[in-house]
């Protein structure tokens, strides 16, 4: 075995030299030099510095501007709340543990950090699923005479929380467990061991099927149908330049959404699956750390992609930041006029 398994931890290094120590009690500088942990702490500080303001601003602007409080925006707010969960409950803890070089908060702290990070990430993931389904239903109209209302929005939010809890809670009650991963400064699901009594294998398979493959399939289907519908609508109005421009904007937005989803989750999921299927094989601590911490950056680019690309929200945000005045009002007004003319296509943009 090329790693060292202990009570509630797994170190990706053999203890043949006697260097390995518990990540709850001792700095792990034998894994990575101190400067590596300092870089990790600086990265987490950057995510906190950007992630908290942009997500908090999203909530504040929506509360400040009544016209943004529509049912279609509920899931976008839910996305911001999920990102704040990750920032407050996960990033702050990881930054402090990185500064110390080990998980200073002990076993209980590992459970708390792992739970909040997993819960926030899963809420965000299932929020994207609900958003893609909402766009598909509203634009492609598979259900005739369907009107997306407040009750549907609340159900979507509740669904995302339920699915997130279905992934984050089991490790707290004995189905799998949270342990320090990578450089031992953040906690996640135990992909590394077949610890007796925790049924890690069944939980990891359940998580990959239900909480990765299913969301990926749903988002791919919904956005694929969305692009086709946009192209069909534009083809029927080829004389309208504004419609063609709206088609390009919407298509670009959808592609960015999908690529961001893949960039966030595929590297982490791929590495986790490799570790799970090659337990005991040799891999370095950075091997899991890089994709795990890259996935955390979703708390920053999620609101940028899903909210700041919304022209109405961007207008309200600029108005709020500029004390009630929008210096770009004329440009926003012309864009709004274009959106009105190309109504059949522009309904694809988040409301």
Swiss-Prot record:
Belongs to the G-protein coupled receptor 1 family. Opsin subfamily. This is Rhodopsin. Keywords: Cell projection, Chromophore, Disulfide bond, G-protein coupled receptor, Glycoprotein, Lipoprotein, Membrane, Palmitate, Phosphoprotein, Photoreceptor protein, Receptor, Retinal protein, Sensory transduction, Transducer, Transmembrane, Transmembrane helix, Vision. The chain crosses the membrane at residues 37-61, 74-96, 111-133, 153-173, 203-224, 253-274, 287-308. The record marks 113 as: Plays an important role in the conformation switch to the active conformation. It comes from Sardina pilchardus. Residues 1-36, 97-110, 174-202, 275-286 are extracellular. CDD domains: 7tmA_MWS_opsin (cd15080). One of its GO terms (molecular function) is G protein-coupled photoreceptor activity. Pfam families: 7tm_1, Rhodopsin_N. It comes from the Eukaryota. The gene is rho.
């Amino acid at each position: 075995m090329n790693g060292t398994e202990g009570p509630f931890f797994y170190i990706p290094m053999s203890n043949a030299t006697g260097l390995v120590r518990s990540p709850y009690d001792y700095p792990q500088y034998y894994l990575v030099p101190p400067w590596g942990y300092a870089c990790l702490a600086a990265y987490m500080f950057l995510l906190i510095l950007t992630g908290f303001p942009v997500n908090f601003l999203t909530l504040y602007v929506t509360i400040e501007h009544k016209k943004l409080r529509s049912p279609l925006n509920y899931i976008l707010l839910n996305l911001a709340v999920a990102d704040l969960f990750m920032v407050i409950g996960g990033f702050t803890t990881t930054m402090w543990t990185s500064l110390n070089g080990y998980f200073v908060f002990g076993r209980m702290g590992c459970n708390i950090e792992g739970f909040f990070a997993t819960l926030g990430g899963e809420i965000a993931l299932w929020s994207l699923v609900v958003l893609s389904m909402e766009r598909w239903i509203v634009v492609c109209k598979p259900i005739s005479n369907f009107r997306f209302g407040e009750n549907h929005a609340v159900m979507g939010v509740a669904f995302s929380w339920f699915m997130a809890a279905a992934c984050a809670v089991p490790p707290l009650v004995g189905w799998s467990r949270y342990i320090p991963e990578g450089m031992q400064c953040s906690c996640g699901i135990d992909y590394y061991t077949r610890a007796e009594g925790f049924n890690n294998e069944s939980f990891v398979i359940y998580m990959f099927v239900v909480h990765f493959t299913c969301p990926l399939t749903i988002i791919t289907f919904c956005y694929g149908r969305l692009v086709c519908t946009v192209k069909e609508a534009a083809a029927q109005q080829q004389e309208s330049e504004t419609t063609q421009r709206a088609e390009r904007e919407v298509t670009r937005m959808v592609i960015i959404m999908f690529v961001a989803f893949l960039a966030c989750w595929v590297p982490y999921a791929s590495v986790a699956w490799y570790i799970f299927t090659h337990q005991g094989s040799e891999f370095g601590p950075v091997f899991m750390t890089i994709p795990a911490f890259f996935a955390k950056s979703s708390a920053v680019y999620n609101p940028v992609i899903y909210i700041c690309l919304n022209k109405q929200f961007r207008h309200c945000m600029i108005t709020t930041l500029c004390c009630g005045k929008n210096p770009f009002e004329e440009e926003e007004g012309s864009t709004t006029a274009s959106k009105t003319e190309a109504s059949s296509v522009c309904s694809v943009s988040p409301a």
